[in-house]
Curated annotation (Swiss-Prot):
<feature type="binding site">
    <location>
        <position position="181"/>
    </location>
    <ligand>
        <name>Mg(2+) 2</name>
    </ligand>
</feature>
<feature type="binding site">
    <location>
        <position position="158"/>
    </location>
    <ligand>
        <name>Mg(2+) 1</name>
    </ligand>
</feature>
<dbReference type="GO" id="GO:0008409">
    <property type="term" value="F:5'-3' exonuclease activity"/>
</dbReference>
<feature type="region of interest" description="N-domain">
    <location>
        <begin position="1"/>
        <end position="104"/>
    </location>
</feature>
<dbReference type="GO" id="GO:0005730">
    <property type="term" value="C:nucleolus"/>
</dbReference>
<comment type="similarity">
    <text>Belongs to the XPG/RAD2 endonuclease family. FEN1 subfamily.</text>
</comment>
<dbReference type="Pfam" id="PF00752">
    <property type="entry name" value="XPG_N"/>
</dbReference>
<keyword id="KW-0227">DNA damage</keyword>
<dbReference type="GO" id="GO:0003677">
    <property type="term" value="F:DNA binding"/>
</dbReference>
<dbReference type="Pfam" id="PF00867">
    <property type="entry name" value="XPG_I"/>
</dbReference>
<protein>
    <recommendedName>
        <fullName>Flap endonuclease 1</fullName>
        <ecNumber>3.1.-.-</ecNumber>
    </recommendedName>
</protein>
<feature type="binding site">
    <location>
        <position position="47"/>
    </location>
    <ligand>
        <name>DNA</name>
    </ligand>
</feature>
<feature type="binding site">
    <location>
        <position position="179"/>
    </location>
    <ligand>
        <name>Mg(2+) 2</name>
    </ligand>
</feature>
<feature type="binding site">
    <location>
        <position position="158"/>
    </location>
    <ligand>
        <name>DNA</name>
    </ligand>
</feature>
<feature type="binding site">
    <location>
        <position position="233"/>
    </location>
    <ligand>
        <name>Mg(2+) 2</name>
    </ligand>
</feature>
<keyword id="KW-0496">Mitochondrion</keyword>
<feature type="binding site">
    <location>
        <position position="86"/>
    </location>
    <ligand>
        <name>Mg(2+) 1</name>
    </ligand>
</feature>
Length: 395
């Protein structure tokens, strides 16, 4: 699920933190990809009449089809992907997982009913909600990646946290996930839409955490508290708190301790803290997630030539993929992996850290821009009000 409304809030309050570009802009970069999120997107995207793609023997192949072709597209564009799989979920997440399972069970029943009585849209909507990434899906995807020569790692717990640790440690340029909590786990750069299909024509979003914090004028701990207040996978949300209220509360009360105290002191009781709301535990999971450090021997990743015959055996003989397509894909992969060895020129130069004076100037300019925007909105609103109030003359 990630963090509710976080991207909307970033876009509104700190748009300079987001760069929009094409996949080719990521040429020569190593990227850590949240595998479970990608596999889930392949399972819900590659569907026809509410059914996943299947082999002749009735086995689901959507995840393998998506992984094979999207990974090839990345390598085609000079990217060196590595995939990170979820390990065991933290204990605090068990409540959220139980709720998800309940929703999927209900959705499955609704999907069956929709097949009998509903429209094609109903069938599609409810079928998507029943999709779950299984251990078998993960194991098959890991087998496929090994045959493709693409490295992967299983995280101790959350894949997003491990992706963030690899980006922070300089093993990769960025973490790629649709889950916004990857930013909460402290990835310097988050890429969204990287594994989307070309047909969707969605730009790659490159979100820079330092600019997010600078634009929101927050320290990291405050940002984590904001994310928890917006709604995360570890805790029930506080009903009635949307993105604007969450930002206002953190700015006014500095941290969650202050926010909770303020809410409890209100006589109107418009907002209520859930009985079991261990926000300090959730904060600690973001501050100190269980991850392998970037210098761990298991994080010594190598991109190798694909095992062409192994791919044919697995995808063609076992999963009944088209042999010509698999062989052509493997040949392209082999050729493009050599191209991906080239380094970007920027890799030879370290970015120059901004001075305190430069940061202050940037902040002042951003504040002035915001003030200007507010003034314009006031003038526009006043003009609109006057135009409405102006009496109409009889013709």
């Amino acid at each position: 699920m990630g963090i509710k409304h976080l991207y909307q809030l970033i876009e509104e309050h700190t748009p300079e933190a987001v760069k929009k570009g094409e996949i080719k802009n990521q040429f020569g970069r190593k990227v850590a990809i949240d595998a479970s999120m990608s596999i889930y997107s392949f399972l819900i995207a590659v569907r026809s009449d509410g059914q996943q793609l299947m082999s002749e023997t009735g086995e689901t192949t959507s995840h393998l089809m998506g992984l094979f072709y999207r990974t090839m597209r990345m390598v085609d564009n000079g990217i060196k992907p590595l995939y990170v799989f979820d390990g065991a979920p933290p204990k605090l997440k068990s409540g959220e997982l139980a709720k998800r399972f309940q929703r999927k069970t209900e959705a499955h029943a609704a999907a069956e009913e929709a097949k009998e009585t509903g429209t094609a849209e109903d069938v599609e909507k409810f079928s998507r909600r029943t999709v779950r990434v299984t251990r078998e899906h993960n194991e098959e995807c890991q087998r496929l990646l090994k045959l493709m020569g693409i490295p992967y790692i299983v995280a101790p717990t959350e894949a997003e946290a491990q992706c963030a640790a690899l980006a922070r440690g300089g093993k990769v340029y960025a973490a790629a996930s649709e889950d916004m909590d990857t930013l909460t786990f402290d990835t310097p750069i988050l890429l969204r839409h990287l594994t989307f299909s070309e047909q969707r024509k969605e730009p790659i979003l490159e979100i820079h955490l330092d600019k997010v914090l600078e634009g929101l004028q927050m320290e990291r701990k405050q940002f984590i508290d904001l994310c928890i207040l917006l709604g995360c996978d570890y805790l029930d949300p506080i009903k009635g708190i949307g993105p604007s209220t969450a930002l206002k509360l953190i700015r006014e009360h500095n941290d969650l301790e202050g926010v909770v105290e303020h809410i409890k002191s209100q006589s109107s009781k418009k907002l209520t803290i859930p009985d079991d709301w261990p926000f300090a535990d959730a904060r600690l999971l973001f501050l100190e997630p269980d991850v392998r450090p970037a210098d761990d021997p298991e994080c010594d990743f190598k991109w190798e030539a694909p095992d062409v015959e192994g791919l044919v055996k697995f995808l063609v003989e076992e999963k009944h993929f088209n042999e010509d397509r698999v062989r052509n894909g493997a040949a392209k992969l082999q050729k493009n992996m050599k191209t991906a060895q080239q380094s970007r020129l920027e890799g030879f130069f370290k970015p120059i850290e901004k001075t305190a004076e430069q940061k202050a100037t940037l902040k002042r300019k951003a504040d002035e821009k915001l003030e200007e925007k507010k003034k314009k909105q006031k003038v526009d609103a006043k003009a609109k009000k006057q135009a409405k109030a102006k009496p109409r003359t009889a013709g």
